[in-house]
């Protein structure tokens, strides 16, 4: 199905030049595959627009200003394209899901992989999915 939606792309090169880079390590895809090799069940949850759930630090909103023919706008949430967006988002998801990491959840970029290794039971996998779903911080914003 063709999705006809707009995705804003803002040139943040000037902001990037003065941004202190977050050195948060992005997981290696081969580590992810090693982790999932024994999984009987797994589900990939795409946290689409996940960045839009992360609040910009108070006072930093003017740094995200974009000017259009309709006026100038500041983001209150983290837009796609900021240098530290991916690291910030991964760090947040790892903090929210800390107690489940490497038990039945892996965070990879803006995706969550929920997996079941120790049981062939679909019922057990569904329980894992519910636990993740009930981590409300993932699905709600201020």
Curated annotation (Swiss-Prot):
Q: Name one Pfam family in it.
A: RVT_1
The record ties this protein, via InterPro entries, to: DNA/RNA_pol_sf, Rev_trsase/Diguanyl_cyclase, RNA-dir_DNA_polymerase, RT_dom
Which top EC class applies here? Answer: transferase
- GO cellular component terms, semicolon-separated: mitochondrion
**Keyword set includes Transferase:** yes
Which domain of life does the protein's organism represent? Answer: Eukaryota
State any single GO MF term: RNA-directed RNA polymerase activity
Mitochondrion among keywords: yes
Query: What is the annotated localization of this protein?
Result: Mitochondrion
What are its E.C. numbers?
Answer: 2.7.7.48
Just give the chief location class: mitochondrion
Which reactions does this protein catalyse?
A: RNA(n) + a ribonucleoside 5'-triphosphate = RNA(n+1) + diphosphate
Gene3D superfamilies listed in its UniProt record: 3.30.70.270, HIV Type 1 Reverse Transcriptase, subunit A, domain 1
Protein keywords = Mitochondrion, Nucleotidyltransferase, RNA-directed DNA polymerase, Transferase
Q: What name does this protein carry?
A: RNA-directed DNA polymerase homolog
């Amino acid at each position: 199905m063709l999705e006809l939606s707009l995705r804003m792309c803002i040139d943040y090169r000037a902001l990037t030049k003065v941004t202190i880079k977050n050195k948060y390590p992005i997981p290696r895809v081969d580590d992810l595959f090693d982790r999932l090799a024994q999984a009987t069940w797994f589900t990939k949850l795409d946290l689409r627009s996940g960045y839009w759930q992360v609040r910009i630090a108070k006072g930093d909103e003017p740094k995200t200003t974009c000017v259009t023919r309709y006026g100038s706008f500041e983001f209150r949430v983290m837009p796609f394209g900021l240098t530290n967006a991916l690291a910030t988002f991964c760090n947040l998801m790892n903090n929210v899901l800390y107690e489940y990491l490497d038990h039945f959840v892996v965070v990879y970029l803006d995706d969550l992989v929920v997996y079941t290794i120790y049981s062939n039971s679909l019922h057990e996998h569904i329980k894992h999915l519910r636990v993740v779903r009930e981590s409300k911080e993932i699905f709600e914003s201020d």
